[in-house]
Regions:
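Helix-to-loop junctions at the C-terminal end of transmembrane segments
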Residues: 85-98, 184, 298-312, 397
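Juxtamembrane intracellular "pre-TM" segments in multi-pass secondary transporters
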Residues: 5-32, 216-256, 434-439
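Transmembrane alpha-helix termini and helix-breaking/packing motifs in multi-pass membrane transporters
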Residues: 58-63, 175-193, 388-404
Length: 439
């Protein structure tokens, strides 16, 4: 999904005028302050979210007695809700005149509200409702946040900018399970204590967003290449958002994101398999996401910068090849703690080579005024596909067992990667114009 950008970007003066946080005659900042502020918000929010994510599978399966099929249904429905809301969030942000912060703030606020409500969720219906609202918040904020990153960064540096943001986000993912582990070990309230602390951290993330992220980002990042065409006075309509799929480059990205999403096992299922195959004690389960997050953090920025210089789509496909190797290790006769660590290394490398890559690629083929909707379209396709994968994998696990279900998924991933390589082979990163969208 990282698409190579080898074109020249014009004179130094043009660059300085187009990119925020720069002065004429000086080299523009590779990572604008807006990206760093959004990274701080994501870091804090991810500490809160990953505290819950780290204990949720065991809480649902061991605490509430839900079967793998039931957990797959719960996980899939929640991802599906977030996917459907994501499109609305991106469109509303664009329609408001690029007021992406307002929509993103609503999303962060909803998620923060849900954390203390988990204290009341001791039955499956209540838990499902709370998680659905939490996913609604995540769906609302994702596209506007990525649109702000795209608009604040010059095209040649988007891979690095998204890499920095994802690295900060992953720092939160790294700290969240550690904090959950510490809370579980230090308190007698167990899961309730984790949910309470998570809610307090989420509120802090909302405060950082309100205080440090600018309300409106006016810089047209695509002006680095050429002056932007005159934009119509009317706000983008919903049909304009759907009409983005007329753009062949965006359509290819969406198709491939969905195709590969259909064969990407959710983290929760993968960690459950690792815990069972590696015979890990239950209290170590929250540490499994830690290994993934650690290598994601180490590699996100260098791989993002590499994608800016080489090819975003090739790096994205290579990342799925790494994931396929991870599936192979889980299915291999090699078990125990070393095998678990090796799988987590590959899993983290997969995320470093793919997460944020899709957003960087999307930003390069969508007009500035449609950034929110463009990010939402591709993200929705991917999330809906992962929703279907969670349902199918949970059913397959219940029918055939976890190992057989993973073997089938791995074979499907290999086929999907080959097809995606063919579809993306001619993809180029040339931003479309508003006229092309409305045509």
């Amino acid at each position: 999904m990282y698409l190579a950008d080898s074109r020249s970007t014009g004179s130094r003066g043009t660059e300085a005028a187009a990119v925020p946080d720069t002065r004429p005659g000086r080299r523009p900042a590779a990572v604008p302050s807006t990206v760093l502020a959004l990274g701080a918000v994501s870091l804090i929010t991810d500490v809160s979210s990953e505290m819950v994510t780290a204990v949720l599978p065991l809480y649902v399966v061991a605490g509430l007695g839900l079967s793998p099929l039931g957990f797959g249904l719960l996980d899939g429905i929640n991802n599906g809700v977030g996917a459907l809301v994501r499109l609305a969030g991106g469109h509303l942000a664009d329609r408001g005149g690029r007021r992406h912060k307002v929509v993103a703030g609503l999303g962060y606020g909803l998620s923060a509200l849900c954390k203390p409500l988990l204290l009341l969720a001791h039955t499956l219906p209540v838990l499902s409702a709370v998680l659905a609202v939490d996913r609604t918040g995540k769906g609302l904020r994702t596209a506007p946040r990525d649109a702000m990153i795209s608009l604040a960064t010059e095209p040649a540096q988007r891979g690095r900018a998204f890499g920095v943001h994802r690295a900060m986000d992953t720092t939160g993912a790294l700290l969240g399970p550690l904090l959950a582990f510490a809370v579980l070990r230090a308190t007698v309230d167990g899961y309730d204590a984790v949910f309470a602390v998570s809610g307090c951290v989420a509120v802090l993330g909302v405060l950082v967003l309100v205080l440090f992220v600018p309300r409106r980002i006016d810089t047209p990042a695509d002006a680095v290449r050429r002056p932007p065409p005159p934009e119509p006075d009317r706000p983008p309509a919903l049909r304009d958002a759907i009409g983005l799929l007329r753009l062949p480059e965006l359509r290819r990205l969406t198709v491939c994101a969905a195709l590969l999403g259909l064969t990407t096992v959710s983290d929760s299922f993968l960690y459950l398999l690792l815990q069972r195959e590696g015979d890990l004690p239950a209290h170590l389960f929250p540490l499994l996401p830690l290994g993934t997050a650690a290598f994601f953090l180490l590699l996100a920025v260098p791989l993002g910068a590499l994608a800016d210089r080489v090819s975003r789509r090739r790096l994205f496909l290579a990342g799925h090849g790494v994931l396929l190797l991870g599936y192979g290790l889980v299915l291999s006769p090699w078990h125990g703690v070393p095998a678990v660590i090796a799988v987590l290394v590959l899993h983290g490398t997969f995320y470093a080579a793919t997460d944020g890559v899709l957003a960087a690629a999307t930003a390069g083929v969508v007009p500035a005024r449609h950034q929110g909707a463009g990010q939402a379209l591709v993200g929705t396709g991917q999330a809906l596909a992962r929703f279907a994968c969670s349902l199918a994998f949970g059913a397959a696990w219940s029918l055939w067992g976890g190992r057989t279900a993973l073997a089938v998924t791995a074979a499907a991933l290999a086929v999907s990667a080959v097809v995606s390589a063919f579809v993306l082979r001619g993809t180029d990163e040339v931003p479309a114009t508003t006229d092309e969208v409305s045509a």
